[in-house]
Amino acid sequence: MSEVLRRANNALSSVKQYQSLLNHFAATQSISKTKALHCHVITGGRVSGHILSTLSVTYALCGHITYARKLFEEMPQSSLLSYNIVIRMYVREGLYHDAISVFIRMVSEGVKCVPDGYTYPFVAKAAGELKSMKLGLVVHGRILRSWFGRDKYVQNALLAMYMNFGKVEMARDVFDVMKNRDVISWNTMISGYYRNGYMNDALMMFDWMVNESVDLDHATIVSMLPVCGHLKDLEMGRNVHKLVEEKRLGDKIEVKNALVNMYLKCGRMDEARFVFDRMERRDVITWTCMINGYTEDGDVENALELCRLMQFEGVRPNAVTIASLVSVCGDALKVNDGKCLHGWAVRQQVYSDIIIETSLISMYAKCKRVDLCFRVFSGASKYHTGPWSAIIAGCVQNELVSDALGLFKRMRREDVEPNIATLNSLLPAYAALADLRQAMNIHCYLTKTGFMSSLDAATGLVHVYSKCGTLESAHKIFNGIQEKHKSKDVVLWGALISGYGMHGDGHNALQVFMEMVRSGVTPNEITFTSALNACSHSGLVEEGLTLFRFMLEHYKTLARSNHYTCIVDLLGRAGRLDEAYNLITTIPFEPTSTVWGALLAACVTHENVQLGEMAANKLFELEPENTGNYVLLANIYAALGRWKDMEKVRSMMENVGLRKKPGHSTIEIRSNSVDTR
């Protein structure tokens, strides 16, 4: 370095020589030599406007924002080059407001420094990223008044800007007047249509591009394949894949990743795996795509096998990969595999990521390992909402209502702001508590914090009031939704129907159901279950049968085991056991334990030992460890005085090591909920 400065001291007698050396430092990204020469300029008293301008440009090209900014601001007058380089630097660093400020300063100098075809693309990008339509129109207006309105690089920047604004029609207007479109122009339109949800327009643009014989590049393929995946257009996706092979565009990993993702979105795991297996190089995105594909397909074993293969190949996972695998372990109740993933996350030093912490808490909760939930939570960041929401949801899932409410109070004390996900997890705890005073407290909180504007929160509160038996309050909230949201979704209708049903008000439940159908909301599986249950608990036999026939006639694809269970229960409560059994024999799939359980319960009520024994034997096969089935059959024998048969059933329970689980309840003592067991 000293030799460089010695030569500089001897040889640098002109500004051009300084500029030549600085240009070399910029080209080689040598920030240390630039700083040394900067020091030499200052100590040697050779500071001039031209040298300061070149130094600013050099720092900018080397990515040293602080020095570039300081020198630029100290210059009494900047050159066009320095303006352009500094604007570019700010845009590339994501400092869009700073880029616009420099542009405004540039424009304010008038004819001394006029923006050119290098300036406008970066300014248009800054406006687009800031989503400032007003600024974008000003920039476009200046471009049209300049000589650069027909410059294809400037026009391409305008296309991207308008697509960022979501103004696809304005982008298309610019595209249509372009005389010299290049592949970037077409790619910008395709990707812009995709990002703004105009899938068919993206397809049309791609077809037009191919018909115009434009040479496709990697960006074209990466822009087009997500469109095929979103539309689940497998044929088009395969055609694009064919073009990739014909034009030899598969050399970049981004293209192969896009192909894998497209086939996954189209539901073709086999073709996605075919591409995956033949990839010479795979990055973490590739692995994550395939693992997510298997998890969404419910194929836990293959997802975990890929995880093991990923570890073997030494690929470092990201948070999304591990969180996806942990979630699938939770859904499949594979706690041991979940623990292995937990250890892997620790070894890979990604354990402290909020996504992973949250997914681990949820996984352990689903696997009934609440102790491990709290262990993960104790080490998690308490400043983020995710872990709090997960631990509250885990407590509710495991019937730890008091713990869930306590955690929510602690969350608020520690000034962590709950979000709608937190409250969606919490409201079932208030419903399980069925305490009107507590329900009113959470209602007040939701109103004060503005969460009542959320349809999800309002639906949860309808359920809470329904469980408390305050159906007037539930219906009042239900009616208030109309004013805020203009329409009610099927989940909200279902909550109110369920509320009336659980309190034996079948007439109102059916009335709400029919009102829902008339309003144009399509019932789903859950709303039918709620309405049929309401009929069963209210003794509305004919109404329930009519509703069931309506479902089979108009919504046959929705019919599930739980709907048949409702009708068996309905007929059983009315003493029509033979009809209930005949219905079971007509079920188009294998009857589940809930169906036979409904019949057995009815047989206990009406002391029908023949059908009771038949139902019990089916249940012993389907769920041999359920003590309730043995108890119900024993109760039938006891009611008929068949004590020996009852003792045989009791002996069967003892032989398989079953014990009846004791019940428990929750009582309130001085505003605190206490679980009694």
Swiss-Prot record:
GO MF terms, alphabetically ordered: RNA binding
Keywords, alphabetical: Repeat
Region described as Type E motif: spans on this chain: 595-670
Pfam families from the UniProt entry: E_motif, PPR, PPR_2
InterPro entries, per database record: E_motif, Pentatricopeptide_rpt, PPR_At4g14850-like_plant, TPR-like_helical_dom_sf
GO terms (BP aspect): RNA modification
PROSITE patterns, per the entry: PPR
Residue stretches of each PPR repeat: 48-78, 79-113, 116-146, 151-181, 182-216, 217-251, 252-282, 283-317, 318-352, 353-383, 384-418, 419-453, 454-488, 489-523, 524-554, 560-590
Family: Belongs to the PPR family. PCMP-E subfamily.
Identification of the protein by name: Pentatricopeptide repeat-containing protein At5g39350
Organism: Arabidopsis thaliana
Gene name linked to the record: PCMP-E16
